[in-house]
């Protein structure tokens, strides 16, 4: 394998023979020099011929590695973490096995990275043919590429899935950011909210060109109604502790970031019986700052006020 690896593409795989074939075919036609790209397919003990299909591309893709698991973990976190352990590229790019990228994607992304010197390059999403997965443009609203953005000044809080984002590996390594292996929903949120907290600047490619196409809806759709409040509060508290412990962030930056994330998580947390109180007990000293923060929305203000009024007390 070449020592000059620019990008590590990480693909978790489980029983997606057709999807992995299409994805790897599209990687074969990249305009970018694929000698500078490693592709890590991390299989979670597929029971179909997905792994065999992937091995057929070994001669076409010079730096293809296939990791095989002895047991099925039941999610994407374990396969992704195994791939992170061996990744060598300057950049990480996560792609789901049902999805694919267009031939100019890597070239455009690295060109933007070199120009901007940003820590993250985000690719706008497009729906693949026959996909019924919802498509939101709110996080990718510019037709042209925008660089040198601060997270607080974007709408990337509406894009908390890790796919389609080039992330500097040194940032993930420095801050020991991993995917959680003890929850089954919103693992991406756990990982990406921590990344968003510590990247200094971000580029978002314009949607005038096609980049990342996704196919199937996630096994558990990421909606407020089917994310268990106990998991939602677990994720938020983990991110809260991570952000609070970052010495390179100012206190104002920490509160800005925590407020933005709480806006997204309020409805999920307040829907539980015990989750609101667990959240309140853990974050109470900071809530008076959050409630006055410039980024807070009305729904979150009401939630915090009701917490202080005791309206979520399980004994009421």
List each model region and its residues:
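Cell-envelope/extracellular polymer assembly enzymes that use nucleotide-activated donors
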Residues: 5-8, 38, 190
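Short aromatic/hydrophobic "clamp" motif used to bind/position activated sugar donors
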Residues: 92
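Short beta-strand/loop segment that forms part of the nucleotide-sugar
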Residues: 35-45, 65-69, 97
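Glycine-rich, basic loop-to-helix element that forms the pyrophosphate-binding segment
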Residues: 69-87
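Short, well-formed alpha-helical segments that are part of the catalytic scaffolds
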Residues: 16-30
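Donor-binding/catalytic cores of nucleotide-activated saccharide
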Residues: 97-229, 246-248
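A conserved acidic beta->alpha catalytic loop
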Residues: 26, 43-53, 71-73
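Membrane-interface aromatic/basic loop that binds lipid-linked glycans or pyrophosphate carriers
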Residues: 1, 36, 270-316
């Amino acid at each position: 394998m070449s020592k000059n690896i620019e990008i590590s593409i990480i693909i978790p795989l489980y029983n997606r023979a057709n999807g992995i074939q299409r994805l790897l075919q599209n990687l074969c036609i990249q305009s970018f020099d694929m000698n500078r790209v490693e592709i890590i397919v991390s299989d979670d003990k597929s029971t179909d011929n997905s792994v065999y299909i992937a091995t057929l591309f070994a001669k076409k893709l010079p730096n293809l590695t296939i990791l095989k698991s002895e047991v099925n973990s039941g999610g994407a976190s374990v396969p992704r973490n195994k791939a992170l352990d061996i990744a060598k590229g300057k950049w990480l790019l996560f792609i789901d096995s049902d999805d694919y990228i267009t031939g100019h994607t890597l070239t455009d992304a690295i060109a933007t990275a070199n120009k901007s010197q940003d820590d993250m390059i985000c690719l706008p999403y497009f729906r693949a043919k026959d996909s019924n997965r919802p498509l939101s443009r709110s996080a990718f609203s510019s037709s042209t590429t925008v660089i040198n953005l601060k997270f607080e000044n974007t709408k990337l809080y509406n894009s908390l899935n890790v796919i389609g984002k080039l992330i500097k590996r040194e940032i993930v390594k420095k801050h020991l950011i991993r995917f959680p292996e003890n929850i089954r929903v919103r693992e991406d949120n756990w990982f990406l909210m921590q990344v968003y907290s510590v990247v200094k600047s971000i580029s978002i490619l314009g949607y005038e060109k096609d980049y990342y196409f996704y196919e199937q809806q996630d096994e558990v759709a990421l909606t407020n109604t089917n994310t268990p409040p106990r998991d939602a509060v677990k994720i938020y508290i983990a991110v809260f502790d991570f952000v609070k412990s970052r010495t390179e962030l100012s206190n104002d930056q920490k509160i800005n970031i925590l407020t933005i994330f709480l806006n997204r998580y309020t409805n999920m947390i307040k829907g539980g019986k015990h989750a609101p109180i667990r959240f309140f007990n853990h974050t109470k000293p900071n809530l008076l700052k959050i409630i006055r923060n410039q980024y807070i929305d009305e729904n979150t203000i009401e939630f915090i006020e009701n917490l202080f009024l005791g309206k979520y007390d399980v004994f009421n």
